[in-house]
UniProtKB/Swiss-Prot annotation:
CDD domains: DMB-PRT_CobT (cd02439). GO terms for molecular function: nicotinate-nucleotide-dimethylbenzimidazole phosphoribosyltransferase activity. Pfam families: DBI_PRT. Gene3D superfamilies: 3.40.50.10210. It comes from the Archaea. This is UPF0284 protein Saci_0020. Belongs to the UPF0284 family.
Length: 340
């Protein structure tokens, strides 16, 4: 059975690859109720660093347990860690602008944490620096790898993604997903519409006002790499693809988005519609946690978390190398059993 669903085509996953996790924060995640990517709004600023640490070390150093939702559902970093362990992948962390820096080796592209997009997220100089340094990084990675899998960790990232998509003219209102089974659409809409009210007219001005550092860095790495890239994420990665398309239309043909079935099945969002507008194919891993012995993992089947830290893309890679959803679940449960 094929455990990878393809929508609008695909890219080849053959060859030597590296997994890149791009982390950042913005002050949007401090808005109460906008994200569940952390037990409290304040803890959301620790989530990207902790996700990065867990991906590399299988333990968190910046906080004393893995990032969880307010109801205790574990970070999708466990899916990425398990999948990439099965295929023995090279994993690199890029800090695009995280308020809390991870206590592991990472690549810094000279970014800053984003502010509240209702005021402004980044200065033009910071956006330009993130973009230029990320392009250089992509160019260097192209010397060693045939393709990249790029994941993200940024709380409230779907809100900044929606703001970017709308500011670039896409029909994306209410189409981005949420880590919660109850997508806080009214709150997101309110924040985003306030953010895009007085937009600068130029591209750099727009993304500096409403983007998060992660999206700009992912775009830069992909542009510099100039070869095949699997953007490992949900609706946020359609915004990264939209930024790429604005800068260099030709690069789009090298890109596919790799996500989870939980994003595709999410009735509160519409990744298929946005990806068609941008012109990128989507692939989804058909993982199944319904028979897991752990309630924290079974919750994924009920619409909690869904995606993040490259969970979809990394599991697509493991599935493409011949592992089954059951193999991946066994590895995830091994890791999860040490956490509880």
């Amino acid at each position: 059975m094929n455990f990878i669903q393809e929508i609008n085509g695909k890219i080849s996953l053959n060859g030597n690859f590296a997994f890149i996790l791009v982390i950042a924060t913005t002050d949007v995640s401090l808005i109460p109720g906008i994200t569940v990517a952390g037990a409290t709004p304040e803890l959301t600023h620790f989530t990207p660093a902790a996700d990065a640490e867990f991906l590399i070390k299988e333990k968190c150093i910046s906080i004393n347990s893995v990032p969880v939702t307010p109801t205790g559902i574990p970070t999708p970093a466990i899916i990425s860690r398990a999948s990439l362990k099965l295929v023995n992948a090279t994993k690199l962390v890029v800090n695009a602008g995280s308020r809390v820096k991870p206590k592991i080796p990472f690549i810094d592209v000279g970014g800053e944490p984003g502010g509240d997009i209702r005021k402004f997220s980044l200065t033009r100089e910071t956006s330009q620096r993130i973009l230029e340094n990320s392009i250089i990084l992509g160019e260097e990675l192209a010397n060693s790898y045939d393709f990249l899998v790029i994941g993200e960790s940024i709380p409230a990232g779907t809100t900044t993604a929606m703001a970017v998509l709308l500011s670039l003219g896409y029909d994306a209102a209410d189409k981005v997903s949420s880590a919660s089974p109850v997508n806080p659409k009214d709150l997101k809409r309110k924040v985003v519409y306030e953010a895009i009210k007085d937009l600068p007219s130029d591209f750099l001005g727009k993304i500096s006002k409403v983007s998060d550092p992660m999206l700009i860095s992912v775009a830069g790495i992909t542009i510099g790499f100039r070869k095949r890239v699997l953007l490992a994420g949900g609706t946020q990665m359609t915004a990264a693809a939209a930024i790429i398309k604005e800068i260099d239309k030709k690069i789009i043909q090298n890109i596919s988005i790799g996500t989870t079935k939980w994003i595709i099945q999410d009735s509160s969002s519409d990744i298929v519609s946005i990806s068609r507008q941008v012109g990128v194919p989507v692939m989804a891993s058909l993982l199944d946690f319904s028979k897991s012995k752990y309630s924290g993992l079974r919750a994924y089947e009920e619409g909690f978390v869904k995606e993040g830290v490259g969970a979809g893309g990394s599991s697509i890679i493991a599935l493409s190398k011949g592992f089954t959803p059951q193999d991946i679940l066994v590895e995830i449960e091994k890791i999860y059993s040490k956490l509880i």
